[in-house]
Design a protein with these regions (language model features):
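Bacterial Sec-dependent N-terminal signal peptides
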Residues: 1-43
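Extracellular/oxidizing-compartment recognition motifs
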Residues: 40-431, 443, 459-460, 464, ...
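Active-site acid/base region of carbohydrate-active enzymes
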Residues: 169-179, 185, 371, 379-416, ...
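Non-catalytic C-terminal accessory modules of carbohydrate-active enzymes
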Residues: 187, 192-210, 271-273, 600, ...
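Solvent-exposed loop and edge beta-strand segments that line ligand/cofactor-binding
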Residues: 291-294, 362, 428-441, 482-494, ...
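Alpha-helical support elements that line or immediately flank enzyme active sites
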Residues: 301-320, 372-377, 442-471, 501-508, ...
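Well-ordered alpha-helical segments within folded domains of soluble proteins
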Residues: 441-452, 461-462, 491-503, 568-584, ...
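Alpha-helical repeat scaffolds
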Residues: 649-656, 687-689
């Protein structure tokens, strides 16, 4: 039965002339020994190690790869309300699961077919004695789907945890019907790299209403089609979706009203709209355009309730900011608060009214916006807007860090940074929520550090590390971003992945998790070793070796500048740092021989880099062996890697600040620049280095832009710019890890002109709290460490021991 079902499934997704081949392959696979499931949950072993009794189900007679929205329903009669009712749920592309009309789960968390996530949900709180309805909306955006959405075909699955709950297992007793009222709207109205999915066109005349309610009559719906049993990852014949439990919680969903109306053309609106639920009557044969302002960037599911208006067309368009003049200046943006004389373009949804009362449009997926433009064109029937609001969504991070000072600017920077970090964290970290929604390693390194310092929740970071590890290709490199259905390779991001893992090792108490990833690190470094010359330097490394969105007029640093011999100091320094990190981890929990090898390679690079790139006349490292290009990037890495130390490092750091001819780091790479300046002894100047963040604020941004050229920044929300949310705690308050797992704490504040500052941050054992107050010429210092944790205070050149609990100086 298992084999025939597998073949039936394959018949739905492969060309007919391939069936014989795959049947033969399945027979061969059946002879292989069964592998252990990748994870286990208490009292849940069976559904993790054997085929599920539930089937993947699909719309009947549907090819499975076309754009469409589908409803699945199952009636459930219960003699008593259960205390628990746990089920596992997944779908391709995505689902929303309802019990008796209440939304209970959204997913699946993004992954790939080798690690396809399912959510475990307790339905008991939503079930009643007697009749119940279990309903799901499943959608497939096909070729229009987001770049981050990997897919096989339209499908849905529910598996009960125990025999009592298996009554809900998906099979052909479930009903399924396509909603013919949906179509995709592609494009955002201007040329740019946009891969975050389509908008929706919903014709309410064709759409199915109230499909999730208990009393909905689905008797005429066809039965769902059974594909194949669900297969946990690791089974001998697992193919298609290899099911694994989601490692992250459900996303937050919180009501969020839109507070401000900026413009209204064609109508006079009643007071209160849209900040409160206020009905707006739009007369027949009228065109109305409303510009709504959330006042800050957000990500939310958008809901529009309306009545009447037979044949009326409504359009919701979403934008981070308005444009100066798209035809004349392209996507140039000015102050993000300005709307007069501006152009509006962006992702959009469109709705056609069927004229009945109580209609509702809910976006399938969340939208990112500060501004919404609502345009309504009525025909012969007036239309009433009953309500318009959002439901904020994001990874459920909690802010567990505090910073108090007499400088209100610091709190504003922290608030904007935290908003940026939250909007760039959903089921994965993302580079940006509006345009890409992709988890890039270079971005993720900084985002994970923000999570450690501000929240202490490391689940999304662990998930990111796992996804990066899963993405490795045969050559050894990670993909630059994952999940992503279009492979992109940035070797320099694979080197930053070594840093991501080293960061996790230093700040989180789970060395076994890190140890499990060391084979992947070896593969990455093995790849780079193939391009190392006799002296250790790199040459002709393939793919896209991205450094930063920086430039100096003669060179674009999205690729490293190389000299006549093909050398790049930046790449050599990154490789050297990766060897250093890997050597530390191998020495403590891996293979000692590899630790020795990596240290030797790092030492060789140290000598080679100094010979090839050091310019004695300038007292700086050049970007290439021709010594005709110099940057903050190369010299930041020189300090961080230990190429220069002590007074020499201080000299290099001062020149980086003073010499404007050096290629300047953008907001992204300032994460490394600022660490280098601190390491070189200039940390008391940290507050003087924040001009780009101040410019963002002055330009009306409520999140940090992608690049430092604010008028031409594509994305207004890139969390790689949220590094102050690390450095106000690590640099200013001085709290840092002093041993793997944050098992020891180093406190070395850099207060600059601040004389009254305090704060706290989460720690694996509790929290770290510090207070620095200057009275006259004397300082009062209080440092509280969590239980079973010790550390040191470095203050004015002296070192003092710290114990768990309160330490006063």
């Amino acid at each position: 039965m298992m084999m025939s079902n597998a073949c039936l499934y394959l018949e739905t997704i492969i060309r007919p002339h391939m069936k014989t081949f795959f049947r033969a392959m399945l027979t061969a696979f059946a002879l292989l020994p069964s592998m252990a499931s990748h994870a286990q949950i208490a009292n849940d072993h069976t559904v993790l190690s054997t085929p599920w009794n539930a089937y993947w189900i699909a719309p009947p007679n549907d090819p499975g790869r076309e754009c469409g929205v589908y409803y699945f329903r199952k009636a459930l009669d219960l003699s008593a309300k259960p205390s628990t009712f746990n089920v596992k749920v997944s779908a391709d592309n995505r689902y929303k699961l309802y019990v008796n009309g209440t939304l209970v789960s959204v997913g699946p968390a993004r992954g790939d077919t080798y690690y396809w996530n399912y959510e475990t949900v307790d339905l008991a709180p939503y079930l009643n004695t007697g009749k119940n309805s279990i309903a799901a909306i499943v959608w497939n955006e096909a070729e229009s789907r987001p770049e981050a959405q990997i897919s096989l075909r339209t499908a849905f699955i529910v598996q009960g945890n125990t025999a009592n709950e298996e009554i809900l297992n998906t099979d052909n007793s479930w009903k399924c019907l396509q909603d013919k009222g949906y179509a995709a709207i592609t494009g955002i109205g201007y040329p740019t790299y946009y891969v975050a999915g389509p908008g929706e066109l919903v014709d309410m005349n064709k759409s199915i209403k109230n499909w999730m309610t208990t009393d909905f009559d689905d008797h005429a719906w066809p039965d769902a089609e059974e594909l194949d049993h669900g297969k946990p990852k690791g089974m001998s014949d697992a193919f298609g979706w290899m099911l694994v439990p989601s490692a992250i919680p459900q996303m937050e969903r919180t009501l969020q009203r839109i507070p401000v109306l900026r413009k209204a053309d064609g109508i006079t609106l009643p007071a209160g709209f849209p900040a409160t639920q206020t009905a707006v009557l739009i007369p027949a044969n009228t065109t109305v355009t409303l510009l709504l302002d959330q006042t800050y960037l957000t990500s939310a599911y958008v809901r529009l309730n309306f009545s009447g208006g037979k044949g009326a067309a409504m359009s919701l368009m979403y934008a981070e900011a308005l444009f100066d003049n798209l035809k004349q200046f392209g996507s140039r943006k000015g102050n993000r608060n300005d709307v007069e004389g501006k152009d509006f373009a962006g992702r959009r949804d469109s709705i056609i009214s069927d004229g009945t009362p109580g209609q509702s449009f809910n976006t399938l997926y969340w939208r990112t916006f500060r501004y919404i433009r609502l345009r309504v064109q009525t025909k012969d029937d007036p239309l009433t807007i009953d309500d318009l609001y959002g439901t904020f969504t994001g990874y459920p991070f909690k802010l567990n860090a505090k910073f108090q000072s007499d400088n209100p600017e610091i709190q504003k920077i922290l608030d904007i940074g935290w908003r940026t970090a939250r909007l760039d964290a959903m089921e994965t970290y993302m580079d940006c929520p509006y345009y890409e929604q992709l988890q890039y390693i270079g971005d993720t390194r900084i985002q994970a550090m923000v999570s450690y310092y501000n929240s202490g929740d490391d689940r999304l970071a662990r998930n990111a590390i796992n996804l990066m590890d899963h993405s490795r290709i045969a050559e050894g490199l990670t993909l630059s971003r994952h999940p992503s259905y279009s492979p992109q390779i940035i070797p320099t991001f694979s080197l930053w992945y070594v840093g991501v893992l080293h960061d996790y090792w230093m700040y989180r108490p789970d060395s076994n998790f890190v140890k499990d990833k060391l084979p992947g690190i070896r593969d990455i470094l093995s790849f780079f070793s193939r391009y190392q010359q006799a002296d250790g330097s790199l040459k002709n490394v393939p793919y896209w070796n991205f450094i930063d969105w920086a430039g100096n007029g003669s060179h674009d640093y999205s690729h490293p500048p190389t000299g006549k011999n093909g050398g790049s100091s930046i790449m050599d320094m990154q490789l050297m740092m990766a060897y250093q990190w890997a050597a530390e981890m191998e020495k403590r929990m891996g293979m000692p021989a590899m630790a020795i090898l990596y240290k030797e390679k790092a030492d060789q690079l140290e000598k080679t880099i100094h010979i090839n790139y050091w310019d004695a006349a300038k007292g700086l490292y050049a970007d290439n062996e021709d010594k005709d290009l110099f940057s903050q990037h190369a010299n930041s890495l020189a300090i961080l890697s230990g190429l220069v130390k002590g007074q020499e490092a201080t000299s290099v750091a001062k020149k980086m600040l003073a010499d404007s001819t050096l290629t300047q780091c953008t907001i992204y790479f300032k994460y490394y620049l600022h660490q280098a300046l601190v390491k070189a002894g200039l940390g008391d100047g940290y507050l003087d280095w924040l001009d780009i963040w101040r410019k963002n604020i002055a330009m009306g941004l409520t999140t940090w832009a992608e690049i430092s050229d604010l008028p031409h920044a594509r994305s207004d929300c890139h969390a790689w710019g949220a590094s102050p949310n690390v450095e106000f705690y690590r640099t200013v308050l001085g709290i840092d890890s002093y041993a793997p797992g944050f098992s020891k704490i180093r406190i070395e504040p850099h207060l600059g002109a601040l004389t009254n500052v305090s704060g706290e941050m989460p720690h694996p054992n509790g929290k770290v709290a510090v207070s620095y107050k200057k009275r006259g010429g004397a300082w009062k210092i209080s440092i509280t460490l969590p239980e079973i944790t010790s550390g040191i205070l470095v203050w004015k050149g002296k070192t003092y021991p710290l114990k768990a609990g309160e330490n006063l100086f």
